[in-house]
């Protein structure tokens, strides 16, 4: 509670226009980095995205051949640049300098899956031609461009021979997208720096992160005999932290009247691209929305949710899939703040509202499983939020005289660190290089490895007010943004790590 009360004071500490400019040596270092390494960082990004560093179930990332090759590439580049390199399994650490105090720069080299059919070229090949000015690839924004940029920012610091009061350690996690346990295990053998900056989010400076939550609800029921149409399958989505772009539904027993009603509803909903395919009295409906990171569901169009609304109010034969559709229409809808889901909706004055994303639906022999991603601000404990989720689901089942579906939850606390000393210099760097004099600290819905480290905040790589493309099927970073990031990351390192008076 104390940290909640201190947040207004934190914001008041950084009024619009406040903060000095970066010192001269930081500005000079940034200029050197841009002059010498702006093109080189893009070349390194092209090398890094070629590695398909996607988690494969049943195989530890640190042991996977693609990850091993990726780590080897980082080691070779670090040694070429004159840095030391240590492999801790779940993380690798690339270091510059031998000062006792240390500055940690946190990033990650693993990426989310990508559907090749949705990319003009292979998602694991840097495409700088299809859309001039954009560097398109899986990992371009999240988080391989920041790795390439940080390495060249460190190289610029080394070139200039700046004396260091803090050793710089670039910490590259290998499991940020799938499992944080290997990072936690590495921290039993690696003592983290006391000052840390993650480069896995957005600007100006991220000082708070919403809690991450998953809710899985499984409906098990055999289709009962009857004359009503029977939903045979309801499926879509790729992974938990993505707004689903694709969804499909197969329904038997469709007559002309139902088909006409569905056609009319689809025509009224132009947010989604619809495809209807009939075979006898069987109808397959496909919906195409827009993928986005599930921490920013407002940037996406949820194909699963919109597909469910097409069948709202229709009498359907009881089945696992029909129960799932009713659940979605009753408790989720096409909103993103949980207003329909019992009492779960709430907001925090700094961190913003709870968001709810229906991420995936899977139809199996056991039934239909819905996976829902929640991003929860401060203001409710995980225990309270879980109770409200379960109460709402129980009320839904009771009202329909249905057995309670299988419910699995995993909820974490919001991240609200005390005010770290690096916030003011980072804001000054951002204000200097962007001209945004009113920039202040922000909160995000995403969850990053920053919360595993002491005194950690996020600084980029994405600009405020610009849709984030990580986790989407159209991930890119602009060429202009990479240059700007190189300036700001170099200035940041020179200011916080160099001993220049």
Predicted regions and their residues:
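Bacterial N-terminal signal peptides
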Residues: 3-13
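Sec/Tat signal peptide C-region and signal peptidase I cleavage site
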Residues: 14-18
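N-terminal helical capping/dimerization or prosegment-like subdomains
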Residues: 19-116, 371, 477
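Sec-exported extracytoplasmic/periplasmic mature domains
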Residues: 46-54, 79-83, 155-159, 267, ...
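Active-site metal-coordination/substrate-binding segment of hydrolases
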Residues: 102-172, 176-178, 473, 478-484
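Acidic/histidine-rich catalytic neighborhood of metal-dependent amide-processing enzymes
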Residues: 143-222, 256, 263, 271, ...
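A short core secondary-structure module
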Residues: 216-217, 222, 242-250, 254-261, ...
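An extended, acidic, His-containing surface patch that forms the Zn2+-binding/catalytic region
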Residues: 290-291, 295-367, 371, 375-391, ...
């Amino acid at each position: 509670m104390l940290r909640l009360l201190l947040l207004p004071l934190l914001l008041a500490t950084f009024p619009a226009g406040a903060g000095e400019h970066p010192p001269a040596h930081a500005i000079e270092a940034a200029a050197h980095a841009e002059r010498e390494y702006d093109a080189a960082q893009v070349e390194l990004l092209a090398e890094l995205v070629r590695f398909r560093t996607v988690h494969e179930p049943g195989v530890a990332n640190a042991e996977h051949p693609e990850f091993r090759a990726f780590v080897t590439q980082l080691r070779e580049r670090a040694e070429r640049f004159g840095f030391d390199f240590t492999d801790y399994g779940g993380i690798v650490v690339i270091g510059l300098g031998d000062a006792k105090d240390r500055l940690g720069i946190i990033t990650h080299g693993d990426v989310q899956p990508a559907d090749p059919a949705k990319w003009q070229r292979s998602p694991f090949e840097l495409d700088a031609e299809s859309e001039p000015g954009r560097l398109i690839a899986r990992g371009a924004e999240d988080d391989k461009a920041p790795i390439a940029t940080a390495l060249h920012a460190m190289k610029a610091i080394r070139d200039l021979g700046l004396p260091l009061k803090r050793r710089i350690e670039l910490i590259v996690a290998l499991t940020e997208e799938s499992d944080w346990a290997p990072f936690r295990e590495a921290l039993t053998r690696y003592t983290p720096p006391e000052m840390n900056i993650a480069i896995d989010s957005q600007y100006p400076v991220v000082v708070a992160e919403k809690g991450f939550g998953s809710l899985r609800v499984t409906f098990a029921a055999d289709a009962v005999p009857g004359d009503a149409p029977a939903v045979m399958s309801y499926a879509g989505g790729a992974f938990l932290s993505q707004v689903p772009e694709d969804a499909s539904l197969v329904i038997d027993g469709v007559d002309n009247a139902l088909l006409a009603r569905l056609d009319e509803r689809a025509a009224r909903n132009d947010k989604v691209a619809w495809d209807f395919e009939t075979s006898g009295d069987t109808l397959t409906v496909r919906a195409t929305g827009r993928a986005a990171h599930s921490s920013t569901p407002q940037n996406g169009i949820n194909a699963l949710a919109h597909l469910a609304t097409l069948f709202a109010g229709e009498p359907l034969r009881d089945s696992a899939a029909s129960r799932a559709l009713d659940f979605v229409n009753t408790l989720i809808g096409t909103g993103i703040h949980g207003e329909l889901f019992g009492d779960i909706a709430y907001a925090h004055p700094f961190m913003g509202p709870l968001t709810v994303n229906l991420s995936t639906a899977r139809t199996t022999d056991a039934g239909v499983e819905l996976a829902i991603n929640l991003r929860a601000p401060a203001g409710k404990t995980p225990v309270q939020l879980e109770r409200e989720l379960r109460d709402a689901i129980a009320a839904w089942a009771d009202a329909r005289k249905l057995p309670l579906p299988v419910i699995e939850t995993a909820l974490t606390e919001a991240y609200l660190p005390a005010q770290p000393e690096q916030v003011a210099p980072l804001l000054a760097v951002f204000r200097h290089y962007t001209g945004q004099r009113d920039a202040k600290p922000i909160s995000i819905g995403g969850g990053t490895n920053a919360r595993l480290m002491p005194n950690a905040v996020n600084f980029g790589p994405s600009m405020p007010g610009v849709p984030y493309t990580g986790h989407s099927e159209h991930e890119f970073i602009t060429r202009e943004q990479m240059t700007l990031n190189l300036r700001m990351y170099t200035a940041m390192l020179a200011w916080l790590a160099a001993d220049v008076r």
